[in-house]
C-alpha cells in the first residue's frame, strides 16, 4: 500500500518538533485516520510534517498557503511551535490553528488570551476530533463547538465542544507506516545522515494515575489495542526498511499476554534481517514473569536497551502521596537477582523532589537499591510539574510546599528570545527538603552514578560492604564529606564544581536542564579532547575527569578508605582489591587486539561474580573487543574519541549496557601455571 499521489486541495501542515529525530507518528496517525473520510481525502492536501528542529523563522517561511496548521505540543517543543504558529497566522489570518498533545491544558483558563493565534485546542486523544474539525471546516459556516473533545476560542474565552469521543477497544486506524505516509520522513533522515527512531504503538492507555504523570489522564486510562495482524505487518515493514532503532510508545509494555508474542516477532525479524537493532520501551510498572520473558527474548536477540524495575521512591509515605504502588524492596531484590542470573541489564528510575521525600529517605533509598543488587544503573530525574498531572493543583502544590523554578530545557544560541526557549517548572524545594539539601542530594546522586554505576568505586564499595560492614549509603555520604573538604584532590575538585553548578542551576534561569555541561566553558574544555557533542552529562564529565587523573584518584581513594578505618595493616587483601578495581576499568590505551593479562593471589574475579572468595592464584585475561549495547563501539589505543564512545556511549539514548569496564565475568580466568589462550571475547 502507498500514500495517494499529491493533489490539489486545502493544505494541511503538521508540526511536532523533537531535539532527537523521532519519526512523526502523531502526524501520520491523524492523517491516515482523517483520510478515511472521503470528504477529507478529496478536500485536503496533506504536506510533509515538520519534525526536525530548525530556526523559527525558517520553519515559518516553509509553510506556504496553509489552510490548517496542527501542532503536537509537548513540554520540549511548546514555545517554538507557538511562535511558528503566530508568525504563520500573521501572514495567513484565515487559516485554522489547532493545538493538541499533552502540553495542551485540560483547563484552558487564559490560554487563548495568551495565545490568540490558536483557534482550537484538542484535549486527549486526537484522531476523532481532528477528523471532525477538518470536516466541519469544509462547511459554509463552520461551528467547531460541534466537534467532540475540543475547546474553541471565542475572543479570549474558551468555549467547550461536545464531550470527547475516544477510539474503541479495538483500534482499527490505518497504519501510516504501511500506507507510505512515513516514507518522506525516513528519506529526509537518511539524506541528512541522521540516526532516527521509529515510534510505534501496540496499545494505548494507562491504568495508573501517578500524581507526577499526565499519561493516565491523557489517555483516559482504559487499555485499547491495535490489531495483531497490523502489528505483524508493521514489524515486517521495520525489518524491510532497515529501521535500526524502535521506540515502543506503550505506557506499560508487558501488561498484556500478547505482548510476549509481539516481542518474539520482533526478535524473529532481528534474526532474519538484522533489523531492528535496538528497542526502547516503557515496561509494565509492576514487573512480572511476562516482562522477564520479554526481556530475556530481547536480550538473547541483542535488542534490549535494559529493563526498568520501577520505583520513583522507596519511601512508603512518598509513594502514597504520588498515588504510586511499587513492587516492594524484597520483590525488587528477587527480581534483581533473577535478571542478574540471566545477565540482563536492569535500571531503576528515581525522582528527586517528590512530596514528603526527605534527604535521609532519598539517600537511604538509593542505598537500599544498591543493597538489593542494582549496581549498574540507577537513574535520578528532577521533578517537573506537567500541565495536566494530577498533582498540578493549587491545593497540592501548597500542601506539599512544592516550590518551582522555571528551567530552560536546552542550551540556546546567544540572543534566543524567551518565547523560543522551552522551559519546564522544576521542583527545587519542598516542605521536606530545602534547596541546599536538594543540591547535596544531587551531589550524592552524581557520586553514585559516575563512581558506582560508572564502576570506579563499585567493587571497592562492594568489598567494604561485605567484609567491613560499611553500608553503601554511609560509604558514599562519607566520600562526599571527605572529598568535599579537600578541594585540592581530584574528587574534591569534581564534587565542589558539581555543587557550584547545581547552585547556579537553581539561581540562573538560562542554565538548561539538558546539555547543562555544554553551558559551562571550563567543563566543555575538559571534554574537548573526547570529541564534540552537546549531550555530555554531568556524570560523563566526572567520569572522564577521573579517566584523565586515574592513578592520582586511586591514591587519594586509598587515603579515604584509611580514614574509614581500613588499611593494608588491618586488611591484607585491600591492596589487591584496589588493583582489581583499577584493572577492570576501560582505559584509553587498551588495545583489543592485544588484550590485557593480570594475576592475583586470590580469585577476585570469582568473588565479585559469585560472592565467594577462593584462596588460589589466578590469571585473568581481558580480551573485550567491543563495548556498549549491540557491541557498537570499538576502542582504539590512544584515540580519545573512540575511547569515550566505548566507555560512555552516545548522548542519546542513554544506556550503561556494556560501558565503563571490562566484562571480567566472561574473562578467561586460569591458574598462572596454565598457558594463556588467545581467543578473543
Curated annotation (Swiss-Prot):
Q: Where is the B12-binding domain?
A: 1-144
What is the catalytic activity of this protein?
(2R,3R,5S)-2-(S-pantetheinyl)-carbapenam-3-carboxylate + AH2 + 2 S-adenosyl-L-methionine = (2R,3R,5S,6R)-6-(methyl)-2-(S-pantetheinyl)-carbapenam-3-carboxylate + 5'-deoxyadenosine + L-methionine + A + S-adenosyl-L-homocysteine + 2 H(+); (2R,3R,5S,6R)-6-(methyl)-2-(S-pantetheinyl)-carbapenam-3-carboxylate + AH2 + 2 S-adenosyl-L-methionine = (2R,3R,5S,6R)-6-(ethyl)-2-(S-pantetheinyl)-carbapenam-3-carboxylate + 5'-deoxyadenosine + L-methionine + A + S-adenosyl-L-homocysteine + 2 H(+)
In the record, the note on similarity to other proteins reads:
Belongs to the methyltransferase superfamily.
Residues binding 5'-deoxyadenosine are 212, 312, 349, 384
- Residue positions annotated to bind cob(II)alamin are 18, 72, 74-75, 103, 126-127, 214, 249
Domain named Radical SAM core: residues = 192-417
Q: What does this protein do?
A: Methyltransferase involved in the biosynthesis of the beta-lactam carbapenem antibiotic thienamycin. Catalyzes two consecutive S-adenosyl-L-methionine-dependent methylations to build out the C6-ethyl side chain in a stereocontrolled manner. In vitro can use methyl viologen and NADPH as the iron-sulfur cluster reductants.
Pathway annotation from the record: Antibiotic biosynthesis
InterPro entries the UniProt entry points to: Cobalamin-bd (IPR006158), Cobalamin-bd_sf (IPR036724), Elp3/MiaA/NifB-like_rSAM (IPR006638), rSAM (IPR007197), rSAM_horseshoe (IPR023404), Tetrapyrrole_Bchl_Biosynth_MTs (IPR051198), ThnK-like (IPR034514)
Q: Where does the chain bind [4Fe-4S] cluster?
A: 206, 210, 213
Induction note: Part of the thienamycin (thn) gene cluster. Expression is regulated by the ThnI transcriptional activator.
- What name is this protein filed under? 2-(S-pantetheinyl)-carbapenam-3-carboxylate methyltransferase
What GO molecular functions are on record for this protein? 4 iron, 4 sulfur cluster binding; cobalamin binding; metal ion binding; methyltransferase activity
Q: Which GO terms describe its biological process?
A: antibiotic biosynthetic process; methylation
Required co-factor(s) are:
[4Fe-4S] cluster; cob(II)alamin
* Pfam families noted in UniProt: B12-binding (PF02310)
Amino acid at each position: 500500500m502507498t500514500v495517494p499521489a499529491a493533489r490539489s486541495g486545502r493544505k494541511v501542515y503538521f508540526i511536532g518538533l523533537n531535539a532527537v529525530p523521532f519519526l512523526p507518528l502523531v502526524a501520520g496517525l491523524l492523517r491516515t485516520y482523517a483520510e478515511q473520510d472521503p470528504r477529507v481525502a478529496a478536500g485536503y492536501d496533506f504536506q510533509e510534517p515538520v519534525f526536525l528542529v530548525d530556526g523559527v523563522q525558517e520553519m515559518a517561511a516553509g509553510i506556504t498557503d496553509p489552510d490548517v496548521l496542527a501542532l503536537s505540543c509537548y513540554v520540549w517543543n511548546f514555545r517554538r511551535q507557538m511562535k511558528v504558529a503566530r508568525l504563520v497566522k500573521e501572514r495567513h489570518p484565515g487559516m485554522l490553528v489547532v493545538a493538541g498533545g499533552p502540553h495542551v491544558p485540560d483547563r484552558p483558563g487564559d490560554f487563548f488570551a495568551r495565545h490568540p493565534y490558536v483557534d482550537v485546542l484538542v484535549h486527549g486523544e486526537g484522531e476523532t476530533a481532528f477528523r471532525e474539525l477538518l470536516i466541519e471546516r469544509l462547511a459554509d459556516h463552520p461551528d467547531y463547538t460541534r466537534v467532540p473533545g475540543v475547546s474553541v476560542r471565542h475572543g479570549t474565552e474558551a468555549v467547550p465542544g461536545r464531550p470527547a469521543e475516544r477510539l474503541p477497544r479495538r483500534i482499527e486506524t490505518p497504519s501510516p507506516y504501511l500506507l507510505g505516509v512515513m516514507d518522506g520522513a525516513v528519506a529526509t533522515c537518511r539524506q541528512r545522515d541522521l540516526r532516527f527512531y521509529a515510534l510505534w504503538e501496540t496499545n494505548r492507555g494507562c491504568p495508573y494515575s501517578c500524581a507526577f504523570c499526565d499519561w493516565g489522564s491523557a489517555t483516559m486510562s482504559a487499555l485499547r489495542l491495535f490489531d495483531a495482524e497490523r502489528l505483524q505487518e508493521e514489524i515486517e515493514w521495520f525489518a524491510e526498511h532497515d529501521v535500526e532503532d524502535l521506540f515502543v510508545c506503550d505506557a506499560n509494555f508487558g501488561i498484556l499476554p500478547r505482548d510476549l508474542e509481539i516481542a518474539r516477532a520482533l526478535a524473529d525479524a532481528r534474526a532474519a534481517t538484522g533489523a531492528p537493532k535496538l528497542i526502547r520501551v516503557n515496561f509494565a510498572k509492576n514487573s512480572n514473569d511476562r516482562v522477564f520473558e520479554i526481556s530475556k527474548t530481547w536480550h538473547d536477540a541483542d535488542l534490549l536497551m535494559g529493563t526498568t524495575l520501577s520505583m520513583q521512591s522507596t519511601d512508603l509515605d512518598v509513594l502514597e502521596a504520588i498515588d504510586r504502588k511499587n513492587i516492594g524492596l524484597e520483590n525488587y531484590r528477587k527480581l534483581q537477582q533473577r535478571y542478574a542470573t540471566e545477565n540482563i541489564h536492569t535500571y531503576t528510575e528515581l525522582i528527586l523532589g517528590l512530596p514528603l521525600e526527605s534527604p535521609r529517605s532519598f539517600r537511604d533509598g538509593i542505598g537500599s537499591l544498591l543493597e538489593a543488587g542494582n549496581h549498574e544503573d540507577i537513574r535520578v530525574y528532577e521533578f517537573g510539574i506537567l500541565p495536566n498531572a494530577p498533582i498540578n493543583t493549587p491545593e497540592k502544590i501548597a500542601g506539599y510546599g512544592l516550590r518551582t523554578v522555571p528551567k530552560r530545557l536546552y542550551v540556546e544560541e546567544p540572543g534566543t528570545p524567551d518565547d523560543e526557549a522551552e522551559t519546564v517548572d522544576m521542583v527545587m524545594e519542598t516542605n521536606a527538603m530545602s534547596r541546599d539539601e536538594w543540591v547535596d542530594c544531587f551531589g550524592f546522586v552524581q557520586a553514585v552514578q559516575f563512581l558506582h554505576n560508572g564502576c570506579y568505586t563499585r567493587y571497592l564499595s562492594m568489598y567494604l560492604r561485605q567484609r567491613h560492614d560499611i553500608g553503601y549509603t554511609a560509604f558514599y555520604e562519607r566520600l562526599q564529606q571527605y572529598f568535599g573538604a579537600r578541594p585540592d584532590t581530584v574528587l574534591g575538585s569534581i564534587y565542589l564544581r558539581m555543587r557550584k553548578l547545581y547552585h547556579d542551576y537553581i539561581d540562573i534561569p538560562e542554565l538548561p536542564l539538558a546539555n547543562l555541561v555544554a553551558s559551562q566553558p571550563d567543563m566543555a574544555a575538559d571534554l574537548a579532547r573526547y570529541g564534540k557533542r552537546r549531550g555530555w552529562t554531568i556524570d560523563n564529565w566526572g567520569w572522564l575527569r577521573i579517566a584523565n587523573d586515574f592513578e592520582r584518584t586511586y591514591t587519594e581513594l586509598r587515603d579515604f578508605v584509611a580514614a574509614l578505618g581500613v588499611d593494608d595493616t588491618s586488611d591484607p587483601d585491600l591492596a589487591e582489591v584496589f588493583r582489581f578495581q583499577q584493572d577492570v576499568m576501560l582505559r584509553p590505551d587498551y588495545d583489543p587486539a592485544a588484550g590485557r593479562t593480570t594475576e592475583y593471589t586470590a580469585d577476585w574475579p570469582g568473588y565479585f561474580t559469585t560472592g565467594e572468595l577462593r584462596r588460589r592464584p589466578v590469571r585473568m585475561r581481558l580480551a573485550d573487543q567491543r563495548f556498549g549495547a549491540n557491541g557498537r563501539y570499538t576502542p582504539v589505543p590512544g584515540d580519545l574519541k573512540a575511547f569515550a564512545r566505548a566507555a560512555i556511549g552516545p548522548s542519546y539514548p542513554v544506556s550503561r549496557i556494556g560501558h565503563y569496564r571490562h566484562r571480567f565475568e566472561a574473562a578467561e580466568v586460569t591458574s598462572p601455571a596454565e598457558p594463556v589462550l588467545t581467543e578473543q571475547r
